[in-house]
Amino acid sequence: MAVLFDICRTSQTKVIIFQKTNLRQLKPKRQFMKDAKQFLQEANAVVPRISAADGIAKHGAGNSLFIDVRDSGDIAKSGTIAGALRIPRGFLEFAADENLPYFNAGLSKDADIVLVCGAGGQAALAGKTLKEMGYQNVCNVGGISDWIAAGGKSEA
């Protein structure tokens, strides 16, 4: 028996492949679009998550580069890690590309980079992006509230 497939586009242009089992009945086979949960799972699989205590130890050693990927409005509300670079998630690719005039000279592909955000999700996504751009030593310390609660140094 030959297997037939149909492709259907939804109103949101999501492409779904259906396997025909009967001319009247179609079963979804797989979707080509990812959702936020899938992006986060992929990011968390390649960007190690460290505890606030481990992040504080790295901060104290002085050998790591801390980057807050939240926007300035969020940083103004809760502060950030003392000495952290402030590179919003939406601008990271431009700031991390050595070939662009927007490159942030504070970044180095050999640096031990520790990312922070509001809860950990943006930092994970940012870390995956940095790894794909050639930055190898990247980790996610999670959210700023955990950092502050653990006694980490912060600034406005």
Report residues per predicted region:
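Leucine-biased recognition of intrinsically disordered, low-complexity hydrophobic segments
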Residues: 4, 23-26
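Polybasic, lysine-rich low-complexity intrinsically disordered segments
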Residues: 13, 20-22
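Rhodanese-like catalytic fold shared by cysteine-dependent sulfurtransferases
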Residues: 19, 28-64, 72-112, 119-156
